[in-house]
Every structure is written in structure tokens, then in C-alpha cells.
Design a protein with these regions (language model features):
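C-terminal accessory region of radical SAM enzymes
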Residues: 121-172, 197-253
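A structural signal for short, well-ordered beta-strand segments and their strand-loop junctions
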Residues: 71, 98-100, 145-149, 191, ...
Length: 285
């Protein structure tokens, strides 16, 4: 854009007609991420709208026809986890270059979404499956950009697998993870909602730190008197439980504080979605 910002959208894709795709291209949109919840039957059931799957794929193809970079978005939960192999099949058949698999992020005390999340063993199995499917695509000469998002335990887990399968590259992976520093909610990531409210990220909207219609974003973001936001700049000093003693804290960043608050009622408690074992996170003596 003229301001030097990269503009992207996440959408269900159903309203992206050929004309709308041309408009998105004309405004120099960088990327369009289209959400799928599985193959046709499951997707339409999730959305509660007949033919939403077909319309999503039509939107995807319309974007591709205009030369827009596209990708798929898939949020993992108990009801659609079995669809992951089918989604990889779609990735191949539709020649889509990118897919993001999102772990559930629940926020707000008593969140109903907690019961939709996988248990730790299921999550480990899913991450292994995603890595296996990604490797199979690469070996078949169809490399794709495959991301897992919103659970920073994935980084250490991938690294530990790399140690077994490719020790030489494992060191490179570890360095990249250290550089990334894991979760950056309230530090490197922020959210401004449609009405100007400022949040630590797009999930944690039950905490509002100010409004850009009333005060400049920079003043809100760097205000030391906004206690929670100020502490988010240095989470490692405040996290508790397993997070506080974890050897991967520097590359995970303490994961999501919103999940900790939703599950335990304490934003500084350990993230309940961390599936690494006590032995795996134990610091060497």
C-alpha cells in the first residue's frame, strides 16, 4: 500500500465473485486466506449453509484467476480433525500453494470452546500427521507452504522430531525458533477492532486497552500505566506453573495468555493447550 503496509484478508470466500476478485487485485491485496472446515459435507454442516463449500472453492478459483496469492485456513477441533487428510488432498488437487492449520484459541472465562479442543495426545498426533503429509508433498515434487498457528509448543515439538530425523537441520530450526521468540501478543502483534478498540491480539477481546479514535495507537501501546499490556511486553517475568520453569520459554514466549485465563481464571497460569511432557520441557541440571 501507499503506507508500506501489506494488506491481506481472511474470508469464507463465498462472496468473492469474479468481479470482486478483480477489485481485490486492483487494490493490490497481497493474500487471500479462505477458510475450510473439511470436505464438502463437514464444511457445509459447520457453516450451516448449503453449498457454502462449493461457493468457497469458487471464490478461491476466482482469486487464482486474477493472480492473487491464495491459501487455505483450517481450524482444528474435535469435530473436524478427521478431515485433515481430505484437506491435504484438496491442497494437491486445487494446486493451492499454502495452508494454515489453526489450533483453537479460547478466551473469556468459561469459554464454551474449551470442550471443542483436542487433548494433548490428540494434538501431538495431529501435528505429526501434518508433518508427515507435508513431507509426502515435498517428496512427490509438490512442495507447499504449510503452517501450524496459535500453539507455540509446535516449535519445540518440530525441533525435537528434527533432532531424530535430521540433526544437522535441527540446529538451523532451533536458531530460527529463537529468532522468532514465539508468541508476541501485546508486543509484536496487536489488534484494532472495527470500532477503534485496541486489544493484545485478535482473540483476547475481553481486555481493551484504549481506543484509537480517542488516543494515538503508539501512546496506548507504550503506556506503562496499562498494567496488563505493559506486562505483556515481558511475559517471561510473570508466567507461572510449567511455563515458568520450561526450557523452551525463550522460543515459545509463554504461548497464549488468553487460553490460560479462559481455563484457569489467571492470565499468567500455564497455557492448558501445551502438549509437551514434563520430561520434554525440563531444564537440564
Amino acid at each position: 500500500t501507499e503506507k508500506g503496509m501489506r494488506a491481506v484478508i481472511s474470508t469464507n470466500g463465498t462472496l468473492i465473485t469474479k468481479e470482486k476478485a478483480r477489485e481485490l487485485k486492483a487494490i493490490n491485496l497481497s493474500y487471500v486466506g479462505i477458510s475450510l472446515d473439511g470436505a464438502e459435507e463437514i464444511h457445509d454442516k459447520f457453516r450451516g449453509v448449503p453449498n457454502s463449500f462449493k461457493k468457497a472453492l469458487e471464490g478461491l478459483e476466482n482469486c487464482k484467476a486474477e493472480g492473487l496469492k491464495v491459501g487455505l485456513r483450517f481450524t482444528i477441533n474435535k469435530r473436524n480433525v478427521v478431515e485433515i487428510p481430505k484437506v491435504f488432498k484438496l491442497l494437491r488437487e486445487l494446486e493451492v500453494p499454502r495452508i494454515c492449520f489453526y489450533h483453537l484459541v479460547y478466551s473469556g472465562r468459561g469459554s464454551e470452546m474449551i470442550k471443542e479442543d483436542l487433548n494433548h495426545a490428540e494434538t501431538r498426533s495431529v501435528v505429526d500427521l501434518i508433518m508427515d503429509e507435508t513431507r509426502a508433498l515435498f517428496d512427490a515434487g509438490m512442495p507447499k507452504e504449510v503452517l501450524t498457528v496459535d500453539n507455540h509448543a509446535d516449535g519445540p515439538y518440530v525441533w525435537m522430531r528434527m533432532l531424530k530425523e535430521d540433526p544437522k537441520r535441527a540446529e538451523e530450526v532451533f536458531q530460527l525458533l529463537q529468532y522468532n521468540e514465539g508468541n508476541s501478543s501485546g508486543r509484536g502483534i496487536g489488534c484494532i477492532s472495527w470500532d477503534g478498540k485496541v486489544h493484545a491480539d485478535q482473540f483476547w477481546r475481553n481486555h481493551t486497552f484504549g481506543n484509537v479514535l480517542e488516543r494515538p495507537f503508539s501512546e496506548i501501546w507504550d503506556d506503562p500505566n496499562i498494567e496488563l499490556l505493559h506486562k505483556m511486553k515481558n511475559k517471561k517475568a510473570y508466567v507461572k506453573g510449567r511455563c515458568a520453569s520450561c526450557r523452551f520459554l525463550n522460543i515459545c514466549g509463554g504461548n497464549f495468555r488468553s487460553r490460560a485465563e479462559a481455563y484457569y481464571g489467571d492470565e499468567w497460569a500455564q497455557d492448558p493447550a501445551c502438549y509437551l511432557t514434563d520430561d520434554e520441557i525440563r531444564r537440564p541440571e
